[in-house]
Amino acid sequence: NMEHPGVEDFYRLPVSGGTPEKLTTMKGANEVTLSPDEKWLAIRFSFINKPWELYLQENKSGATPQQITNSVSEEFNSYRWRTPEVISFKNRSGNEVFARLYKPVNADPNKPAVIFVHGAGYLQNAHYWWSQYFREYMFHNLLADKGYTVLDIDYQGSSGYGRTCRTNIYRHMGGADLNDQVDGAKLLVEKYGVNPKAIGIYGGSYGGFMTLMAMFTQPEVFKAGAALRSVT
């Protein structure tokens, strides 16, 4: 993730040290296995709106990967899945926070929005590959179809952003991580024209816990919430 925290590439580095040489070219996640003779790369690749497929590429910089599997159905391809923007904003502490933003083509007149809180705390979801939250990704497409703006935040405690981000919630869960949701709601209002009286929040597991904390402690920000399989 040298180029962006939401992109995974494969690099070659001499044993003696030096400058890493990037071998992969596809933006997303590249999970690489070397062939026994080290002449080929087997790449398990996905993008935001494209599930995992297998590619083969020569083990050299600039080589063109060739797709060798096609696993999705005609039904899947019949829908125009969105590529949400991967954005970043500064939270109240000055930390850069990454998020996925789904913008409706035809916004509901009430300008509503939904904030999604991923689970575990230590996961990463504001990235450029196919999410393990693919069901929520599909739901967010539906919400955008219905005129909602959706924000999916990698809040404090999420993985992929270094030690400080991971430890900012130490001994105070529902503090700095919840602040990021509130700051995200503020961003939606100030930058994207969302109605401040029409913002909801939802999530499962740790995201359910965060939803409960939001509803109990920030009712002036979030007008509705759905806490799924909450950690209590």
Q: What is each residue range found by the language model?
A:
Residues 12-15, 78-79:
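Flexible, solvent-exposed coil segments and beta strand-coil junctions
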Residues 14-18, 59-62:
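Short loop/turn segments that connect beta-strands within beta-propeller blades
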Residues 23-27, 70:
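Surface loop/turn motifs at the tips and blade-to-blade linkers of beta-strand repeat domains
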Residues 31-232:
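Serine-hydrolase catalytic core recognition
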